[in-house]
Structures are given as structure tokens and as C-alpha cells.
Amino acid sequence: MHNLQVRRHYAALKGFYLFAFLGTGSIIPLLSMYLTKEQHLSGSQVGLIMSLGPIVMIFFQPFWGMLSDYTQKTKGLLAVCTSITGIIGLAYIAFDSFPLFILIAACFAAFQSTIIPLSDSISLRYTQETNGNYGGIRLFGSLGFGVAVFAMGQVTNQLYPIHVIFIFGCAFLCIAAILASQVPGQQKTTKVNIRKGFRELISNKTFLIFMIITFTTFAPNLANNTYFSLFLDKSGASLSAIGILFFIGVISEIPFMRFAQTFIDKMGLLNVIMLSGGVSLFRWALYFTAPSLWIIYATVFLQGVAIGLFIPAALQYVKKITPRHVEATALTMYAAIGNGFGNWFCTFAGGYIFDYVSIFAVYLLFGILSIAGFGLTLYLMKAEKNKHTLHQPAVTFKP
């Protein structure tokens, strides 16, 4: 493959992740504040709107994956859905009705749910074909999200009204859509029968077990984004400190994503997944004990270890254990379990625990889930050593 073309494709992929996450990072973290401050919605109304995203993703992410596998037009689908996501975001400015906000939130989540799994599918396939580093591309997403959260907080606090987050978000997502049209395409393969492909995945015991690992290990890290500010506030952190710690946590993912492939090459996929799960478990156990603020400051980088290593390793593992012709479906099912159902469950259950017990008890729930994920990862590691004890379909692509 021509070196110049490869460099252009890598630049397009990095640019897409950067601007796509700049877009979503501009809107999602401050959406609840916009609905509360400018639209004067109640807490329960805001909670309902914010909970729609994960629920919608549960259903739509597998749909987009199956559509991608069937049409084999992944990058076109990605470009269209990314631009539509940004345009839908503008509707929050145009309307001021709670029922319409519910509709807008559902539509926004439906199209936004394509961004991560389809771009990951393209990036994983291309880095494998060119012996590249997926983590070196994906880190631009963490960079974009971290910069967006920090910058939008400053912009809306000092310069402009909060509704500008939708204008910036739309602009960034439209730029990402243009870049999506420049990413590498995929080679044509035999079109998959959607029902047959889905049955193939749900009959894959290894895949199903790993979906549970994703639910128990990765989902608490996502739900932590909802409760971390409450945890910090209860621990005595100021508002400015909370913003800085959020930023440091997101940015800390970058170096670990950058060197994740080095860890994977030396340790193996499941060992890296177990390492990230162990770090998550340690973090939740620490937070459950209501530590001093200086300990929280000193350990915030653990988010980078837990998420920065898990994402590249988990995606490559899903790709490894599933046939190529249902790859996009598998990745979107993985996203639906982690970003969708798992995130929703941990956030929903955590809300009840926070209301009736304490914010620190929320991290006990996260810790219990992480213990289960750690144990299942050990099970898969043993099963890999004794492959005859665990049935899995033949993989139809070269690793």
C-alpha cells in the first residue's frame, strides 16, 4: 500500500476521532446544566432525558452494525450519521418543550450511537492491515473530549451563553463527517445474512462471556462520569478542582492508549484486560473507603490505566473471537452492552444507592461488579489454555 495514501488515511482517522469527540464532548457533559439553567426543567425531567441515551443505544447500536455488515458501506454510514447527530443537537436551541426534548434526545442518541463502534471497526481493520497502532489513533478521541469539556466550561462561564455548546458541537461533528468520507474503505466480502450472523454471535460462548466482562468491568467506568463530581464534592473538592480533576482523568487516558499496543504485544490481550480490570477494582475499593482528598488527587490517573488499556485490548479481543463478516455487528453489540445497557444499569442502580445510602456505597456496587468481571477474565484465560473446554466458532480472517 502506498505510504502517502496510508499517511493520509491515518490523518483522516485521527482527525475524525478528534473532531467527533470535540463535538460530543461539547454537548453531552453540559447538556444537563443547559436543561436546568436555560430551560428550567426539573431534576426528574432532566434525569429522564439524560437516561434515554444509553437505553436507545442498546437497540440502535446493533442495528447500525448489522446494517453496516449488510451494506458494506461503513464509512458512508458513519459520515451521514455523524453529520445528522450534529444537526439534531441544534434542535435543543430551536424548541423549549419537554416532550420535544425527549424526542430530540432519543434521535440524538440513535444517530450518535454509530460514531464509536463504526469508527472503531474501520480503525481496527485498517491498523491490522497496515501493522499500525489502534491506540495511537483512538487517543485523539480522548484528547478531543478532554479539551472540549475544559474549553466549553471556560467559554460558557466567561464569554457566551450556555446554548453555544450546540453550535460548537454541530460544527465539530460536521467537520468530523467530512473527515469520515476520507477514511479508508473496506474490502468487499460476501454479504452476511443478518439473522444468521446474529445467531452466530449469540451462539459464541466466548463472545457472550466477554460481553458480561464488558458489562461488569467497563460499564462502571462510564457510570463513574455521572457520580465522580458528586463523590469529589462530598470529599471536599471545590468546583474548579472538580473541573481540573475531570480534565486530568480524561487526558491521562492518552499515554496509556498510545502505548496500549506495547502492553498487548508483551502481555497478551486478556492479561491487559485483567490488568485494567484490577486497576478499576482497586480504584472503586479506594473510593468506597472515603479517602482523603490528596489521595484522590494522587490516584486520578488510574482512570487512564483502566480505560486507556481496556478499550484497545477489548476491541481487539472482540475482533479476534468473531468472524470477519459479522465484525461490525459484534463491535456494535459490544458497545451496546458497555455504553448502553451496562452504563444505564450502573447509573440507574447507583442513583438509588446514592439516594438511600451514600455516594461512597455507589463504589461498593462498582467494586462488586468488577470482582465478577475479574473472575470471568481469569476463566477465559484458563479456557484459552484448554481450548477444548470452551466452544468457539472458527475465525475466518488472518490475525
UniProtKB/Swiss-Prot annotation:
Keywords: Cell membrane, Membrane, Symport, Transmembrane, Transmembrane helix, Transport
CDD domains (UniProt xref): MFS_MFSD6
KW Transport (keyword) present: yes
UniProt similarity note: Belongs to the major facilitator superfamily.
Top-level lineage group: Bacteria
Stretches assigned to the Cytoplasmic side: 1-8, 72-75, 124-134, 181-210, 260-269, 316-327, 380-399
Annotated source species: Bacillus subtilis (strain 168)
Gene (UniProt): ywbF
Keyword Cell membrane attributed: yes
Pfam families for this protein: MFS_1_like
Gene Ontology CC: one annotated term: plasma membrane
Protein's membrane topology: Multi-pass membrane protein
Record's subcellular location: Cell membrane
InterPro entries, per database record: HcaT-like, MFS_assoc_dom, MFS_dom, MFS_trans_sf
Protein name per Swiss-Prot or TrEMBL: Uncharacterized transporter YwbF
Residue runs in coiled coils: none
GO MF annotation list: cytidine transmembrane transporter activity; symporter activity; uridine transmembrane transporter activity
